[in-house]
């Protein structure tokens, strides 16, 4: 008799996803981040659900309700800090996952890559709206500054911003709708993840060498299930170290001050995982130009497959491209640092140079490096 997991309609789907899936035999730890992202998403949905049971999305009570969760709700503090630091872990895994895709040429699987970009944008939107909910100073002013960027859109900008706010400033209507969106979007993300996997399993996974692994596949279970469990344990270890020992390490102290529309904080900045994009936004002394650069800093990923000039898929055997990739990684760290600094000399100049370098590497240097490497190999 055939095993039930191979014939039952529901078990068959899970079997083809997680058990009998043919996987390349040589995928490294960089391929662990997909499963880690799934773990992060599940964790965020669960902790978020329990937080939503005690949170109130009203300007007069939002801040107090978060305080109430931390002080009075049974293990509320751990749920709150797992959710806040879970977002940081989520973005670390996201950036590693995208970086892996860039390094090993996984963007040649264009459908999977494009759904991935949509996923990235959706998760960023979700995180931004979540940051507004505690209704601290940085929540309020972050929401004001970022939503105000839409006013740079010619002709309809101001109307659009006031439509999103639900009034003439960030207020109760804004908070309520942000809570509604923050609650629903993770489920949209879950649906997109299914589409992401659907497209991935149409072609099969890439591998570090960049060549087809059809002739050498192994079953996902037990080889990669055990590997994913190890990755998950490490992820949870790092998360719990953060939560237990320094839960506010990655947060902003200003968010422990209740939102006050009459007092602007000296340095308005988003969470650390948006600082690179914020630095690019600030590096252009023109509102519309800054907004376009901010959008392009993420949307540039969509044209990466078109800029691929090398005859090899990944960067494993391409030293010039490798150097450029790690220069890009260092540049992103520099931008992240600059985004958290005040707008004054020398940070303005460093930010502008780092922003120019970011776009130059992706749009100019990497395609040129691919051509040079082809010529070196006489291809």
Swiss-Prot record:
SUPFAM superfamilies with a match to the protein in the record: a domain/subunit of cytochrome bc1 complex (Ubiquinol-cytochrome c reductase) (SSF81648), Transmembrane di-heme cytochromes (SSF81342)
GO biological process, one term: mitochondrial electron transport, ubiquinol to cytochrome c
Domain of life, per lineage: Eukaryota
Positions of transmembrane segments: 33-53, 77-98, 113-133, 178-198, 226-246, 288-308, 320-340, 347-367
Membrane topology: Multi-pass membrane protein
Residues reported to bind a ubiquinone: 201
InterPro entries, alphabetized: Cyt_b/b6_C, Cyt_b/b6_C_sf, Cyt_b/b6_N, Cytb/b6-like_sf, Cytochrome_b, Cytochrome_b_C_euk/bac, Cytochrome_b_N_euk/bac, Di-haem_cyt_TM
UniProtKB keywords: Electron transport, Heme, Iron, Membrane, Metal-binding, Mitochondrion, Mitochondrion inner membrane, Respiratory chain, Transmembrane, Transmembrane helix, Transport, Ubiquinone
Subcellular location: Mitochondrion inner membrane
Pfam families: Cytochrom_B_C, Cytochrome_B
Binding site for heme b b562: 83, 182
Cofactor, free-text remark: Binds 2 heme b groups non-covalently.
Gene Ontology CC terms, in alphabetical order: mitochondrial inner membrane; respiratory chain complex III
CDD domains: cytochrome_b_C (cd00290), Cytochrome_b_N (cd00284)
Cofactor: heme b
Principal location: mitochondrion
Residue sites binding heme b b566 per the record: 97, 196
Oligomer and partners: The cytochrome bc1 complex contains 11 subunits: 3 respiratory subunits (MT-CYB, CYC1 and UQCRFS1), 2 core proteins (UQCRC1 and UQCRC2) and 6 low-molecular weight proteins (UQCRH/QCR6, UQCRB/QCR7, UQCRQ/QCR8, UQCR10/QCR9, UQCR11/QCR10 and a cleavage product of UQCRFS1). This cytochrome bc1 complex then forms a dimer.
Note: Heme 1 (or BL or b562) is low-potential and absorbs at about 562 nm, and heme 2 (or BH or b566) is high-potential and absorbs at about 566 nm.
Alphabetized PANTHER family for the sequence: CYTOCHROME B
Annotated family: Belongs to the cytochrome b family.
Protein name: Cytochrome b
Organism, as annotated: Otaria byronia
